[in-house]
Amino acid sequence: MSDDQFHHPPPPSSMRHRSTSDAADGGCGEIVEVQGGHIVRSTGRKDRHSKVCTAKGPRDRRVRLSAHTAIQFYDVQDRLGFDRPSKAVDWLIKKAKTSIDELAELPPWNPADAIRLAAANAKPRRTTAKTQISPSPPPPQQQQQQQQLQFGVGFNGGGAEHPSNNESSFLPPSMDSDSIADTIKSFFPVIGSSTEAPSNHNLMHNYHHQHPPDLLSRTNSQNQDLRLSLQSFPDGPPSLLHHQHHHHTSASASEPTLFYGQSNPLGFDTSSWEQQSSEFGRIQRLVAWNSGGGGGATDTGNGGGFLFAPPTPSTTSFQPVLGQSQQLYSQRGPLQSSYSPMIRAWFDPHHHHQSISTDDLNHHHHLPPPVHQSAIPGIGFASGEFSSGFRIPARFQGQEEEQHDGLTHKPSSASSISRH
C-alpha cells in the first residue's frame, strides 16, 4: 500500500464557505468542508483550537493520548517510516476496516445540528459577563451617622443634609442640661469637705439661677477656645475684691490684695469677677476677730492670717467651663481650676481706723487676724496655724516696718505676700 493513498486531496475552493447561520455569528468560527466531513476553524485563533464536526458534535482536532498509548503509537509510526502521526493513524484504520465495519452504525450526521451544538457550547462562554454585586444601601440610621461623621457633629453641612442647624457649634444639638452637668462633673469634680454635696439637679438649678438662660445659645453662637494655656498674666489680675466699706482712708484704698503679682502664681482668670457681684453676695464669709487685748505684743505677733475653706458646692462657679468669651476667656492662666478663686483679703475697719489715729503714729499697727474664706479646699492660714496641725509664722518674711513718714505701714502678712 503506497503512502499516497492515505493523503486526501484538498477540497475545491467551492466547498469552502462561511456559515451564515446565527450560530456561526455567535462565535463558532468558519466551517470548512473537507473530505469526509467538516471542520470548524476558530476565527482569529490558531489552528490547533479548531474543532472537527462529528456525529456527536464538534470535538477537538487534536487527540490527546495517554502516556503508554502515545509511546506505542510513536513506535508504530517509526516502524512504518511515516513522518506524520496522521499517516500512521490512517494506516491503522485501513488495517482494521473489517473490524470497524462490524461495529454498530452511528446516526447520520447533520452539519446544521453540529453548528447549533457548537454555538450552544460556545455562546455561554462568550456571553457570560461578570456580574458586579452592588452593595445594598445602608439603613437610614447608618446614613445619618455617616453624614455626621462627614460633616462633623453640630456643624452645618451645606443646608440640604442638616436643615435644622442654622449655626455652627461644637456642642451637638441633642445635649441638654443634664448631659452638660454630667460632663462638667466628670472633668471638674466638686469636692465638699464637711457638708454633703447636693445632687446634679440642684447644682444645675443654682447654676441656671446665677447665669442668664440664654447661656447655651450664646455658647453655641460663639466658638469658645477651651484649651488650657500656660501663659501668665502680664500685669497681674484685676483686684480680687473691692473693699466693702467705701469710707476707708487712702491707706486702706491702696491696700494690696492677696496673691496679687505680675507673675500671678495661682493663675486664676479673674477678668469677670467684678461683674459678678450677684455671685459674690452668695459666698459665705467667715470673719473671726482676735479676742486679745488692744495693744499687747500678742496682737502684734499674730498679724493677719488667711483661712481658705471650701464653700458649699452650690456656690461653685462653672464659668471656666461655660461662659461668654469676652468675659471669661480674654485672659488665660495656667491650668484653670474648677473652683472659683474667690480669694478675699480685707481688714477690720474699726481697728484699721484706730491704727491710723494720730496718737499711734510712732507705734505698730495692731490689726486683728482676719479669717478669709475661699473656694480652694484644704488650704488654711489662720493666725499662723493650720487646722491640720501644721504651724507657720504669721508673716512669711521680714518684720513689721516702723512708720517713719507718719502715713502708712505694711498692714499684715497679705501685703508682704502680695509684693513677692
Curated annotation (Swiss-Prot):
One of its GO terms (cellular component) is nucleus. This is Transcription factor TCP4. Expressed in cotyledons, particularly in the vascular region, in leaves, roots, buds, flowers and immature siliques. PROSITE patterns: TCP. Residues 45-103 form the TCP domain. The gene is TCP4. InterPro entries: TF_TCP_subgr (IPR017887), Transcription_factor_TCP (IPR005333). Residues 410-420 have a biased composition (Polar residues). Induction: Repressed by the miRNA miR-JAW/miR319.
